[in-house]
UniProtKB/Swiss-Prot annotation:
Belongs to the MsrB Met sulfoxide reductase family. Pfam families: SelR. Its EC number is 1.8.4.12. InterPro entries: Met_Sox_Rdtase_MsrB, Met_Sox_Rdtase_MsrB_dom, Mss4-like_sf. This is Peptide methionine sulfoxide reductase MsrB. GO terms for cellular component: cytoplasm.
Length: 143
């Protein structure tokens, strides 16, 4: 069950709350994970559900973490976003219903997709901590 807005305001930073609950966007190149190079898993800051692997992360030059695919396509929800005078595809986490960012059809192969994700919506779990933090079942992604 998703925490109440009051609980989320206590638990998240103002930026994390704005991004995940109000569909905000953090500044490019001034966010926690755009240049993260370690191997690991990116999980939803609200629910902890696994979202993206460092194995699918690449430098898109945009200043936000970019991925070619989610860990589990069923773990995300895509919605049409018509804000800012354009039509884009918003990406949200399925269980936490957190706004994560957007997906664009201009990524590298093999998918041709660029999941442009706000660092503020994510928590990074280094590969060496996966077992301890309950994500041991995903270690196969890094072998």
């Amino acid at each position: 069950m998703k925490p109440s807005r009051e609980e989320l305001k206590k638990r998240l930073t103002p930026l994390q709350y704005d991004v995940t609950q109000e569909e905000g966007t953090e500044p490019p190149f001034r966010n926690e994970y755009w240049d993260e190079k370690r191997e690991g898993l990116y999980v939803d800051i609200v629910s902890g559900e696994p979202l993206f692997s460092s194995r699918d992360k690449y430098d898109s030059g945009t200043g936000w973490p970019s991925f070619t695919r989610p860990v589990d396509p069923q773990g995300i929800v895509e919605r049409v976003d018509r804000k800012l005078f354009t039509t884009r595809t918003e990406v949200r986490s399925r269980n936490g219903d957190s706004h994560l960012g957007h997906v664009f059809p201009d990524g590298p192969q093999p998918t041709g997709l660029r999941y442009c994700i706000n660092s503020a919506a994510l928590r990074f779990v280094p590969v060496e901590d996966l077992e301890q933090q309950g994500y041991g079942h995903l270690l196969h992604l890094f072998q």
